[in-house]
Amino acid sequence: MVVVLSNGGAVQLPWAGRVDAVLEAWLGGQAGAGGIVDVLVGDAEPGGRLAESIAHHVAQLPADRNFPGRPRQVQHREGPFVGYRYHDAAGVPAAFPFGHGCSYTSFDWTDVDVAGDGTDLRVSVTVANVGERRGRTWCRSTCATSRARWSAPTRS
């Protein structure tokens, strides 16, 4: 069974382990249904990746402690620690982390190299599609500071 979600924000998915796949379509607009069908029947690659982390439960998130707040006032006290930054800093694994996604093909990542003087960095990697189908993937790099004068995320 494949579940297709069409929603405007992250939702809890405690049942996700009991289905074959979850396709998060977000708000696809008037052309969204055609794209969803193309992915489901294999005519298009599900190349998108999550742009946010999805927690196991909303109570894991720091913003939940400040909800609902006073009438007409929302408290945003989590600072920079939202999404993957919170999960990293708190050591709380996400159900589906930032960047999660599947593909109809496979990729090999080789020749990873990071060079620089500590101020300017150059990151390079060779990515090869080693599967039988066309597909796309993406490279994500993050960095950390060891000398922050404020409470800073582990990675950013």
Predicted regions and their residues:
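Short aromatic-acidic-glycine turn motif
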Residues: P62, C143-S156
